[in-house]
């Protein structure tokens, strides 16, 4: 769900974030590049990370909160991702995902 418009730091200045599979798989890990759907050659969220993953798994990009939303944009007409606060065993949705209608809401064309 995420792309460089949601987490710009890796594309902008090669910042790194921890990456993990939420299913907590540890066997048969391989090296992966975690990329987003934006049609840019710099849309990497992580490069060469060793995790086990398969289609349908959820991958966490860790410690992204401090600069996530404030550096995020609607580049490529992409709504910004939701934000989830995780502490211990609890999680809470603290900002909902934007919708395409949210993007259009700010547009005006005068006659």
Give the positions of each predicted feature.
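Charged (often Lys/Glu-rich) extended helix/loop segments that serve as interaction or gating elements
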Residues: 1-111
């Amino acid at each position: 769900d995420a792309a460089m418009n949601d987490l710009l730091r890796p594309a902008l200045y090669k910042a790194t974030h921890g990456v993990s599979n939420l299913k907590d798989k540890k066997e048969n890990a391989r090296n992966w590049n975690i990329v987003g759907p934006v049609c840019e050659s710099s849309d990497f969220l992580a490069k060469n990370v060793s995790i086990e993953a398969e289609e349908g798994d959820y991958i966490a990009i860790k410690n992204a909160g401090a600069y996530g939303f404030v550096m995020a944009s609607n580049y490529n007409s992409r709504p910004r991702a939701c934000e989830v606060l995780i502490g211990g065993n609890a999680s809470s949705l603290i900002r909902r995902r934007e919708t395409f209608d949210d993007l259009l809401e700010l547009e005006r064309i005068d006659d």
